Amino acid sequence: MQKNAKHGKVVIPSDASPWPHEKRVARILALAGHYVEFIPETTIKTPDIYLERTVYEIKSPTSNKLDAVERNLTRALEKCPNVIFDSSRMKVRDNQIRKELVKRRKAGKGLKKLIFITKQDEIVDIEELV
């Protein structure tokens, strides 16, 4: 992923209520130099953030099973074709999750962009691994 500056920025509008795990993802992206803006809540399903003017849905499941990856990608695609998958709350090893994300990206299924945030706060662009 392309960096814009030494440190990016996180914008949280007054009518947005991000979850703590979503704020964590935004902070990691901003520290890598990206501009992140949370999207205000509405009554319809909307993505969570703008990342460099592109909408993304953040998924950070709490599970100890690898099948949570596919289930959460499917849920994310109901809102947006661009997904950020955060493994910090999963009890599955990052290398297993990464393999599953690459597999799902190769299968297509409506995904345009897929970013993986590891337990060590590493940002992995899955497109580069496909």
Residue spans for each PLM region:
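A short acidic/basic microdomain associated with nuclease active sites
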Residues: A30-D48
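Short, solvent-exposed polar/charged micro-motifs at secondary-structure junctions
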Residues: T46-Y50, V124-E127
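Metal-dependent nuclease catalytic core centered on acidic motifs
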Residues: M1-Y35, P61-V130
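Conserved catalytic cores of phosphodiester-cleaving nucleases, focusing on short active-site segments
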Residues: I49-T62
